[in-house]
Amino acid sequence: MPGPLNGIKVVEFTEIIAGPLAGMLLADMGAEVIKIEPPWGDPWRLIQSFSQTESRPFLAYNRGKKSLTLDITTPQASDIIEKLILEADVVIANYRPDVAVKLGVDYTTLYKINPALIYCENTAFGRKGPDANRPGYDIIIQAMSGLMASEGKLSGESPEHISSSPMIDTTSGFCLAWTICGALFARERTGKGQMIETTLMGTALMLLGSRISQVESMDFFSRRDTVESLSAMRQAGVPFKDLIEIYQEEHPPTSGTMYYRAYQTKDNAIAIGCLSDPLRKRLLNILN
């Protein structure tokens, strides 16, 4: 049975995780996705590889696609790209903004070829600002956004990054696919394509959610004092480990955390998630 995106053509200028995951999700929904790779391949092919050109991570984010080897830095590539773009509905790119322009696969250039194109660009920090042309990986954005520190976990004396999965890259991939589907729906109504911008930093801030949202009447003074105090100690060279301990002493866990955590029991570890009063009462009854 054809998927909901059957007939949609996607050209993908991406590598590693966020962009490739978005393309894979669109392919899962029936789109024809053509991944453009340089002659040496997506770097992800070489991570945990089981052959000269394949790896588990690469397969995990690139199933269901067609692959085209093309050195887009050469003049000969421009004709091939133009033919692809003329027939494309969507382009996904995750280069730095300056790199996309240099390679001639930026929105302004491709719009001239196909004005109905939906162009989705994922960068680390966005197109404007002092960090616009800086590269960024999941771990860098974890650190800069505060996501890493918010976990309050240590690896020795340093903050421990979230390593079980590339959280920011993965969530960004879903955001890319989600916004592309929205743009395709808008084009059905208006006939117009558009440019979409997503960023790793924006994704990280979204994931932080209530940790960075502020209700002025409740949070302003308490958070201001905490931030000023911790900032002063950090500038004075207080180790991160000590900062975490100070923060946790001043902000003890709420009563709700006992109902949403893991416990070691006599025979095994268990995880409990009881966020509502009815569930908490049932848990208390079970525990007698």
Predicted regions and their residues:
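Acidic, glycine-rich segments within the central catalytic cores of soluble metabolic enzymes
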Residues: 144, 148-288
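N-terminal helix-loop segment corresponding to the beta1-alpha1 unit
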Residues: 1-189
